[in-house]
Amino acid sequence: LDLGKTPLANELQPARGAKFKQEIFDLIVGKCDDCMHIQLLTMVNPSKFFKNYPYFSKINSTTDVRFQNLSSSLDRRYGERNDNFLIEIGSNDGSLCAKFLSLGWRVLGVDPAESPVRYALENGIDSICDYFSSSVAENILDKYGLPNLIIANNVLAHSDHLRDIFLGIKLLMNNQTVLVLEVSYGLKVFENFLFDTIYHEHTSYHTLFSILPFLDSYGLKVFDVEQFDAHGGSIRIHI
């Protein structure tokens, strides 16, 4: 699916009159015939998105309600330890971590966006400003130990280094650790013509058909899947 050349979706232009050269990039979606994974064929350096990332989770009231419901639900299901510990990959400004913190969890966020992470730290959310990777996971393991819950909401769409991300996730898991992933549901993207969700920051579009074998290759077994309406249609995968 060739959508031509477009500028970056979240690249804000300066005030009128300032000189600004806006780059454009190919926006082409392809599907692998072997594994059925759907992704962009041209990848943009992620520093162009995250160095001056404008999005803060806290500004979205709908997201706040969803985070409140999610934290309460996951606390009931998986908050069985006396020392519950959450690691959130793609934690942004710490809004979801803060919900768990109020429930008595120890929390750690990891996110590459400087301004949201700075906000999280200023508001008492332990956070690492970096792209999550196997090397970051090793450092977390040494300093913090194993969590009993890992959350990655809308993270997998934003990276073309999924294998290293999952190597890192595996390092932080044992038999008692639960991983919860949220992804925009690729089936709904194409079934409902959600073309506005296709832009350079979203490198991948996931379906269960493609993601289940991928998870299985890391020995990760899915035991529950929820479908909900966020972002035009999403799925939450419990592993």
Residues covered by each model-derived region:
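Short, glycine-/aromatic-enriched active-site segment of Class I SAM-dependent methyltransferases
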Residues: 179-204, 208-211
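A short glycine-rich, Lys/Arg-flanked "PGG" loop and its adjoining helix->strand segment in the class I
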Residues: 163-178
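Conserved SAM-binding strand-loop segment of SAM-dependent methyltransferases
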Residues: 124-139
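A conserved beta-strand element that flanks and buttresses the S-adenosyl-L-methionine
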Residues: 148-151
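Conserved SAM-binding loop of SAM-dependent methyltransferases across substrates and taxa
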Residues: 93-104
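N-terminal juxtadomain amphipathic helix
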Residues: 1-62, 226
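Conserved class I S-adenosyl-L-methionine
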Residues: 82-92
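Conserved SAM/SAH-binding beta-strand->alpha-helix loop
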Residues: 113-115
